[in-house]
């Protein structure tokens, strides 16, 4: 097999800001965000999905593309699968076991971890 090596360029604060801003409508506190990036502060982001069935292209293309931008900008990202919200909103018949089974199929990578609340 072939192993490839490549250099990863450290992004400037401005480059990180542009990644974060890409394909967004609005950023509240742009100046504060720029200052945090200049200072090298660690940023965190989370996004949550109510489980209502199998994921669709909007999840994969739009939401995950933005998560990738954030991760590329050095932001620590968490993705929450809102099983409890799905249950109380009677998604998938309100069956928590089915909800968890469907949710577990959203991400099949070995490094995915599921915390059920």
Model-found features: residue ranges?
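Non-catalytic terminal extensions that flank enzyme cores
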Residues: 2-52
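Structured alpha-helical segments in the cores of large, soluble enzyme domains
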Residues: 33, 68-75, 102-107
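Short active-site-proximal "capping" loops at secondary-structure junctions
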Residues: 50-54, 84-87
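Short secondary-structure transition/capping motifs
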Residues: 52-55, 59, 95-102
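Histidine-anchored nucleotide/phosphate-binding helix
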Residues: 57-79
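Short, flexible active-site-proximal loops enriched in glycine and acidic residues
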Residues: 73-83, 114-117
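A glycine-rich phosphate/pyrophosphate-binding beta-strand-loop-alpha-helix module
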Residues: 80-100
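A glycine-rich helix N-cap at a beta->alpha junction
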Residues: 99-117
